[in-house]
Amino acid sequence: ADNHARVAGPRAVASGRYATEKAFLQMMTRGSCGLPCHENRRCGWACYCDDGICKPLRV
């Protein structure tokens, strides 16, 4: 198992995992718009990389 999980305890791990998933979901939607982007860091599906900044796609 993971050493960090044993140290933090199951409740902390669960809340940490929830926060990570929530952040990931925000990143995958419009949450990533406005963030810097480059070749290795792409924007979420609702955004595109324009001049180094994630901008919302016009639908």
Swiss-Prot record:
Removed propeptide positions: 1-30
Tissue expression per record: Expressed by the venom duct.
Molecular-function annotations in GO: toxin activity
Modification after translation: Contains 3 disulfide bonds.
Claim: RNA-binding is one of the keywords in the record: no
Keywords (A to Z) from UniProt: Disulfide bond, Neurotoxin, Secreted, Toxin
GO terms for cellular component: extracellular region
Major subcellular site: secreted
Keyword Secreted attached: yes
Places the protein is found: Secreted
UniProt free text on domains: The cysteine framework is IX (C-C-C-C-C-C).
The protein's role, per its UniProt record: Crassispirid snail peptide that induces sleep-like symptoms in young mice (12 and 14 days) and hyperactivity in older mice (16 days), when intracranially injected.
Extra facts: Negative results: has no activity on N-methyl-D-aspartate (NMDA) receptors.
Name of the featured protein: Crassipeptide cce9a
